[in-house]
From Swiss-Prot:
It comes from the Eukaryota. Belongs to the G-protein coupled receptor 1 family. InterPro entries: GPC_Orphan_Receptors (IPR051880), GPCR_Rhodpsn (IPR000276), GPCR_Rhodpsn_7TM (IPR017452). Residues 1-38, 97-109, 171-198, 291-306 are extracellular. It comes from Mus musculus (Mouse). GO terms for cellular component: membrane; plasma membrane. It is found in: Cell membrane. Residues 60-75, 131-149, 220-269, 328-373 are cytoplasmic. This is Probable G-protein coupled receptor 45.
């Protein structure tokens, strides 16, 4: 089946084409494999929903956690939640049945929502990357919670403006069963191809280029800072310092080392998110361009299998983010333990006073311009 309408309404494509409907036995994927992929996708829905919900709850319930960067992370989590709820269940059902049971109009709507929430997530990741660049490289920490909220609102509007034309008919959409989800289809019309290029560039290639340049600059700055701190420590003549001066210098060195360690750890967390985004979305971006421009690829026997793999990989990003948070962010792990019912908490909680004795670095508290990452 295929659904499509033109940008100017001067021609119409066939909305329903029975000849494109595949029987379950005709799909390149065997029934056990389809069911396994669907079950894995259902697990991804559960993990992605619960993990990202915890992020939103932490930021909502704790005023101290409502820094600019944490508001951005909560927005990223919310976009992943909506992607898990609005798109993934229908793809899982279609994987099992090899038929789209929700109509061609809802197919186009689901594809629009898919691109909408993906665009928002990418926009937030891009904003976080630029913010880290300004803080570490340019030493400009101008993003406060108020500005972050304004930028978040603007990103939602921009994501909607870019994704909405796909619902109104600015590109050709393929309805399953040729793919397990409504995807960009092959077209020879220049306007439709131009929109596909715009969409893919906005989702992946432009953000990837900006983030890659930002991270390379950050890596270079962090390396230089580490060398400078090390050289300053080696060049000191402690015999020329008084007792008070020595204590003050040691405090300055400790603070500089702590700030460098904090920024490096925060940057490493964001860098891991960037790597996950790149691995999950590079195949999908190439696949989308080939679908729109290559007739041979689009009508090949392997198109259904390729569609299933790249869609499954793109959804994996929604699960990847909360796993990274749990792995890298101590406050996130602590909040997860606190949110668990008491019957599931195996280890008793250590009082904060004792934690400070065990780990003196816990006295370092982030201000509102720093994050828990």
């Amino acid at each position: 089946m295929a659904c499509n309408s033109t940008p100017m309404g001067t021609y119409e494509h066939l909305l329903l084409n029975v000849s494109n409907t595949l029987d379950p036995g005709d799909t390149p994927l065997s029934a056990p494999l389809r069911i396994s992929l669907a079950i894995m996708m259902l697990l991804m829905i559960v993990v992605g929903f619960l993990g990202n919900t915890v992020v939103c709850i932490i930021v909502y319930q704790r005023p101290a956690m409502r820094s600019a960067i944490n508001l951005l992370l909560a927005t990223l989590a919310f976009s992943d939640i909506m992607l898990s709820l609005c798109c993934m269940p229908f793809t899982a059902i279609t994987l099992i049945t090899v038929r789209w049971h929700f109509g061609d109009h809802f197919c186009r709507l689901s594809a629009t929502l898919y691109w909408f929430f993906v665009l928002e997530g990418v926009a937030i990741l891009l904003i976080i990357s630029v913010d880290r660049f300004l803080i570490i490289v340019q030493r400009q920490d101008k993003l406060n919670p108020r500005r972050a909220k304004m930028i978040i609102a603007a990103s939602w509007v921009l994501s909607f403006c870019i994704s909405a034309p796909s619902f109104t008919g600015w590109t050709f959409m393929e309805v399953p069963a040729r793919a397990p989800q409504c995807v960009l289809g092959y077209t020879e019309f220049p306007a439709e191809r131009a929109y596909v290029v715009t969409l893919v560039v906005a989702v992946f290639f432009a953000p990837f280029g900006v983030m890659l340049c930002s991270y390379l600059c950050i890596l270079n700055t962090v390396r230089k800072n580490a060398v400078r701190v090390h050289n300053q420590s080696d060049s000191l003549d402690l015999r020329q310092l008084t007792g008070a001066g020595l204590r003050r210098l040691r405090r300055q060195q400790q603070q500089a080392s702590l700030d460098l360690s904090f920024k490096t750890k925060a940057f490493t967390t964001i860098l891991i998110l960037f790597v996950g985004f790149s691995l999950c979305w590079l195949p999908h971006s190439v696949y989308s361009l080939l679908s729109a421009f290559s007739r041979r690829f689009y009508y090949s026997a392997s198109f259904y299998t390729t569609s299933t793999c790249v869609l499954w990989l793109s959804y994996l990003k929604s699960v990847f983010n909360p796993i990274v948070y749990c792995w890298r962010i101590k406050k996130f792990r602590e909040a997860c333990i606190e949110l668990l019912p008491h019957t599931f908490q195996i280890l008793p909680k250590v009082p904060e006073r004792i934690q400070r004795k065990i780990q003196p670095s816990t006295i370092y508290v982030c201000n509102e311009n720093q994050s828990a990452v």
